[in-house]
Amino acid sequence: MKYIKSPTMALAMSTLIMSTLMAVSSANWMFLWGAMELNLLSFIPIMMQSNNNQETEGAVKYFLAQALGSALLLMSSTSMWMTFSMISNFMPLTLMAAIMLKLGSVPCHFWYPSVMASISWVSCLILSSWQKLAPLSILAFLLPQKNMNFMLSMAAMNALLGGVIGMNQTQLRTIMAYSSIGHIGWMMSLAAVYKPSSCIMYFVVYCILITPLFMTMGYLNMFSTKHMSKLSSYSSTVHMALLMVLLSLGGLPPFTGFMPKLMTIMLLMQSMKIILLILIAGSIMNLFFYLNIIISSMPLPPHLKNVDSTDIKCSLKFVIPICTLSLGLSPFIML
């Protein structure tokens, strides 16, 4: 409601939507660059809505990262016209780096988790969904022809890094940031094999899944895994619905989030088994910390309330990896 009541926020939101649509529908690099600059300037007031120091710091980090990406985008897109220059040979790679920086993809992901940890859940939702639409569309529709091998290697790195580092986090917003990095790996793999429509479909499913999750976490003021215990005080319907969203986000069959991953597996199975293996390994690690969040949200039964919690945690350290690894066996059998 605060966005509607404030004229500044209403203007920022409308400009944010229009600038993204302009960028997606653009047929000119300069027009695309201008639309993405307008998008950047529109999102910063939304990030700083509560005027606290943490959100201001996150907005500054976001501005610096996106400004660097915009500079690389402008330089590379204009230099590609100069076919006689030796520098123009490196411009497609520079353009790729600019888009990956704006997307928050490996190896240009340095700003993304820290910004996510500094802003509100509503801003996190916009940053993880709407703000990725324009760079992801460019990545899917314009760039894969000359960068297939590079994109596949970056997709594998996204999946691995998102899973490995995400397992060591306790802050929910940081976990969701590394989860997003892992999902970017799956989207990039679809873009690399010339399936842009499948890439966008995966992105739409991802946005549908994170929207109720982020909104609920923001409503309940949950910022750490220990705050997940608040869910047990609400109705069992809300609790179970959020747990199902988490499992779906992890790609567990037969939930909705498994469908785009199954589609990716079928597309990559014939000729890119190594990349597929790495993607599945990263997805299993993602599922590990989703299960960790789910267990944190479950209340202990009465007969276990007097049991030492360290004993339970030690046993879960063995149970969770075994359960998570067993869930990933079926794709390997298909290979």
Swiss-Prot record:
<dbReference type="GO" id="GO:0005743">
    <property type="term" value="C:mitochondrial inner membrane"/>
</dbReference>
<feature type="transmembrane region" description="Helical">
    <location>
        <begin position="28"/>
        <end position="48"/>
    </location>
</feature>
<protein>
    <recommendedName>
        <fullName>NADH-ubiquinone oxidoreductase chain 2</fullName>
        <ecNumber>7.1.1.2</ecNumber>
    </recommendedName>
</protein>
<dbReference type="GO" id="GO:0006120">
    <property type="term" value="P:mitochondrial electron transport, NADH to ubiquinone"/>
</dbReference>
<feature type="transmembrane region" description="Helical">
    <location>
        <begin position="7"/>
        <end position="27"/>
    </location>
</feature>
<keyword id="KW-0496">Mitochondrion</keyword>
<comment type="function">
    <text>Core subunit of the mitochondrial membrane respiratory chain NADH dehydrogenase (Complex I) that is believed to belong to the minimal assembly required for catalysis. Complex I functions in the transfer of electrons from NADH to the respiratory chain. The immediate electron acceptor for the enzyme is believed to be ubiquinone.</text>
</comment>
<dbReference type="InterPro" id="IPR050175">
    <property type="entry name" value="Complex_I_Subunit_2"/>
</dbReference>
<keyword id="KW-0830">Ubiquinone</keyword>
<keyword id="KW-1133">Transmembrane helix</keyword>
<keyword id="KW-0813">Transport</keyword>
<feature type="transmembrane region" description="Helical">
    <location>
        <begin position="58"/>
        <end position="78"/>
    </location>
</feature>
<feature type="transmembrane region" description="Helical">
    <location>
        <begin position="200"/>
        <end position="220"/>
    </location>
</feature>
<keyword id="KW-0472">Membrane</keyword>
<feature type="transmembrane region" description="Helical">
    <location>
        <begin position="147"/>
        <end position="167"/>
    </location>
</feature>
<dbReference type="Pfam" id="PF00361">
    <property type="entry name" value="Proton_antipo_M"/>
</dbReference>
<feature type="transmembrane region" description="Helical">
    <location>
        <begin position="274"/>
        <end position="294"/>
    </location>
</feature>
<feature type="transmembrane region" description="Helical">
    <location>
        <begin position="315"/>
        <end position="335"/>
    </location>
</feature>
<keyword id="KW-0812">Transmembrane</keyword>
<keyword id="KW-0249">Electron transport</keyword>
<dbReference type="InterPro" id="IPR001750">
    <property type="entry name" value="ND/Mrp_TM"/>
</dbReference>
<feature type="transmembrane region" description="Helical">
    <location>
        <begin position="81"/>
        <end position="101"/>
    </location>
</feature>
<feature type="transmembrane region" description="Helical">
    <location>
        <begin position="240"/>
        <end position="260"/>
    </location>
</feature>
<keyword id="KW-0679">Respiratory chain</keyword>
<dbReference type="InterPro" id="IPR003917">
    <property type="entry name" value="NADH_UbQ_OxRdtase_chain2"/>
</dbReference>
<comment type="similarity">
    <text>Belongs to the complex I subunit 2 family.</text>
</comment>
<keyword id="KW-0520">NAD</keyword>
<keyword id="KW-0999">Mitochondrion inner membrane</keyword>
<dbReference type="GO" id="GO:0008137">
    <property type="term" value="F:NADH dehydrogenase (ubiquinone) activity"/>
</dbReference>
<keyword id="KW-1278">Translocase</keyword>
<feature type="transmembrane region" description="Helical">
    <location>
        <begin position="110"/>
        <end position="130"/>
    </location>
</feature>
<feature type="transmembrane region" description="Helical">
    <location>
        <begin position="174"/>
        <end position="194"/>
    </location>
</feature>
